[in-house]
Structures are given as C-alpha cells and as structure tokens.
Amino acid sequence: MNIAISFTQAFCTHDEDCLEGQCCVQRICIDCNVLKLHRM
C-alpha cells in the first residue's frame, strides 16, 4: 500500500529542526496546521 505525500519532507528530531510553522512528527517535518486538523 503506497501512501503519497504531496509536500516535500525534511528529516528532523525536534520541531526546531523544521521550518517556521512546522512540527516534527515521526522524524519528518509537517505543517503544524495540518497536524492540528488531523488531531481533531
């Protein structure tokens, strides 16, 4: 089963490793706004 991710991923260990407004989740940077939507 392939899961396509539409945006580029950066490897990270902490939120600080990501761009502004991004969070480190499972060692990849994703937009924190996207994360909040998924958590609702």
UniProtKB/Swiss-Prot annotation:
Source taxon at top rank: Viruses
Protein name as catalogued: Uncharacterized protein 384L
Annotated organism of origin: Invertebrate iridescent virus 6
